[in-house]
Amino acid sequence: ECPVCHAKNAFNEVKGEIKLAAEHKFGVYAETVKNNPDISEEDKKYIFDQLMANFNGECSEVGMYLCMARIAHREGYPEIGLYWEKAAYEEAEHAAKFAELLGSDLESNMTASTEKNLAWRVDCEYGATAGKFELAACAKKNGLDAIHDTVHEMARDEARHGKALQ
């Protein structure tokens, strides 16, 4: 019965295991290309290199687009700034899809397990906090206030990420 209109035939009861018609998968490259004897080593290398290059390119675009958004906002172009932010998010989605295709071939610590990924990234965020703090201290020592202030704030962000993931 429909919970809104109370029609008797609005729903069909599902019995047994539910099967999804389609689903995203982690590590498609390893599953379909890496050990596939029907694909030449040359093509395997090309596919892997292009997946990696696209992942890295998409990640770079995220940073550049957000930088351009900040510039546009400072110059008084909020609509352009907001569009750059939207484009950056879309590029981040592209990077995520390349990462998902590459799976553990992108980063051996990355797995299809949320629990394992959380534990790994907590350690990474704590390491990133320390690394950025050291860079900020070096910048401060050399009188580079803009670099110090920006990187020190990023270190705090990394610490917050680590705490949140913990």
Where are these regions (language model features)?
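Non-heme di-metal
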Residues: E1-Q166
